[in-house]
Amino acid sequence: MKPIRLELREFGPYKHEVIQWNEIINEPMFLITGKTGSGKSTLFDAFVYALYNKTTSGKDIASLRTKTADDKNRTIVIFDFELQGKHYRIERTLAYLKTGNKNLTSGKVCLMEINAGIETILATKENDVKEKVEQIIGLDDKQFCQIIILPQGKFKEFLLSNSNEKKEVLRSLFNTHFYQKFVDKLQNFAKTLDSNYKLKERELATKFEKFDFE
């Protein structure tokens, strides 16, 4: 996945920020630096929030809204990215509680594909967006954080995770599901052959019992 553009409005410490990732992403290596609390980790939270409506640390997404945001301003993340030659955009608006209101102002989400400047909406409902994002990227939110983000302090957690969890993450990373399916088919075929062989063996034994060789 190649990030193209990230726009943040009332998100964490960012009142309104636009980052053109395509201007630096082709560099062999780049570094995001800044003082503690300046918003470095918030950028990765923005990726995860936009795609999965989650945070990298599992904290409440309501905490992503800028503390000093005016009630009339919505918290919005717009994330453009490229994958397998296709340009996608996901725009997500955070639900929030206005001062004096008892009910939340609802959030919104829209996933679209952009081709030659033409926007095609792929999904606008939360469950549909979740399913489509996982289909496009090939990872759920937990796998995305482990493989793409790997938040601070989580590397040790990944190393200490059980074998099955590691296996699933590495399968997703190296896209080896096809080979696993092939292995499963071979194993099932081998079991079928073995069952047929044993069946024929029993049938032959039964037939030989009918003969008297004395």
Regions found by a protein language model. Give the residues of each.
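Extreme N-terminal "head/tail" segments of very large remodeling/mechanoenzyme assemblies
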Residues: M1-E131, D141-Q143
